[in-house]
Amino acid sequence: MTFYILVVSLYLSLFLVTVVQSDCDTDVEQRERNIFLWSVKHPQFASSQGYLFGTIHVPFTEVWKEVSDRVRDAFAVSDTVLLEIDLHDEATIHELIACKNLAYDETVHSYLSIELLERIEKIMEYLRSSFLAWAQKQNPRDTKKIKHAEDIYNNIIGDWWRKRPIWLLFLLYQMCENVFEKSSSPLLDLYIAQRATDEKKTIIPIETAEEQCNPVVSVSTNEIIFAIEHTVHYFEDKILDNPSKDNESRSSLKELVEHYKCGTLKEDMFDKDGMSIIDYATGTTERFKADEINKKLKQDIFVKRNLRMAKRIEKILKGRNSNTVFSAIGAGHFFGSSSVLTYLEESGFIVQKLKNTDVIQPLRSPYRQTAKFKRVWTKETAVRRKSIIIEEVAPSSSRIARLWLVPCIFLLHSIFAIFP
């Protein structure tokens, strides 16, 4: 109901979320479990086979045990892997890192009022104190922990005053979570990308760095500032004034992740709590403005983006004869009447939701691929993390992993853990 809830849903398509231990309902039969895998085939292109896998943007070690063997099979027989963006291209990575900031000579002073700026400064100081307190609590005598906390603050939050409006908004939401609780393991999406590289599969990005950098095009700067103000209000009300409610604010995210792991994620969960900011919009004019912003954000992040992704997936599937294509994008893009699946069906594709009991049939002999598949997906110690972790050099500190920069866009690798 607050703008915070809306940003939660968006952030699940671009960034990270806190993960909880699996506590699935054992009564849910395996055949009913949603494994977030669909087969896609066009009658006129029988020599090509596509698989769509709905990912979640959390460390792969947190969800790996729950990933169905059918997903592993589909990846094993694939020749081509479609990802939201190519994170192995240096130019792309540099563009993603740079795009969140304003021009060199600009700061947030150019678009924030003095009053709002001071409120954000108070929040940032609270976060810095929290980081240092956490580090000291871990081991009071370990100066490296405290230094590590300082580095993380400087790297992730330190240059907040240079952020573009939309990225300041995303940053404020991210700060509602405990950065230190996040695993250093690669995200599931990045893990798949690294496995595809190791297997010498063809990798094709579905979106460009420019599209990832600018996920919201219909919302004006003034509207984003309006959203920032309400997010700041949420932070002040739920966290600064009531620290004990901090964990409550994260429950919806944890619930989404838990349902993903258990295969019980349903479409109506994405509309839980309304995804609205009108709780803090008291006047009639404010309520109308909040509603208009909500509509624009949903249109940009879900409807327009799903259509764009579906068209590109369609083009790739039709253009790769005798190939098996494995697409890994945020699971949220497969829900709703304007989903990627809906658009593909409207384009003549036969889309089938797969179950654990289904059998993946390769187009060609699977022997070579199966051998590699077993090494890739079972020998976790072989993961080369450095090649799939985006890092940024802080001006006065060591290099700190900037996993949260991975878009999704993701937006929303799509805001979200669920949407990329």
UniProtKB/Swiss-Prot annotation:
EC number: 3.4.-.-
This protein's record includes keyword Transmembrane helix: yes
Main location: membrane
Pfam families hit by this protein: TraB_PrgY_gumN
Membrane-spanning segments: 401-419
One Gene Ontology molecular-function label: metalloendopeptidase activity
Residues in the Extracellular compartment per record: 23-400
Protein function: Metalloprotease.
UniProt-recorded name of the protein: Metalloprotease TIKI homolog
Lineage of the organism: Eukaryota, Metazoa, Ecdysozoa, Nematoda, Chromadorea
